[in-house]
């Protein structure tokens, strides 16, 4: 599975976990149809779940005029996943994480999602580089 596809499936799983309040294993089963789970996909989903408190704290610090709870569900899942990658996935360049997140936002979010996600993650990137 290519990493782009793994990110799409991770987004779908994280959305289910957040909105449907289902366990990560069940969400992964749902998005893979019960098939083999790509290691990168598993890393993204469990990494976000494991570090969600720190991720959310970082996102809250970089949201202007928004609360994390008011952010659209799909955008919130994208922001969490990209922030996880930027902070914890050493094998993924930060610029790749940011670009992939913007593409996912354009595909799965509304017409403003791409620029919103780009703006927030650019601030997260700057905060992480301090």
Curated annotation (Swiss-Prot):
A Pfam family annotated for this UniProt entry: NusB
GO biological process: DNA-templated transcription termination; transcription antitermination
Protein name (Swiss-Prot/TrEMBL): Transcription antitermination protein NusB
GO CC, any one term: cytosol
Keyword GTP-binding: no
Keywords: RNA-binding, Transcription, Transcription antitermination, Transcription regulation
The family this protein is said to belong to: Belongs to the NusB family.
Superkingdom of origin organism: Bacteria
GO MF entry, a single one: RNA binding
Gene: nusB
Protein purpose: Involved in transcription antitermination. Required for transcription of ribosomal RNA (rRNA) genes. Binds specifically to the boxA antiterminator sequence of the ribosomal RNA (rrn) operons.
Cross-referenced NCBIfam families: nusB
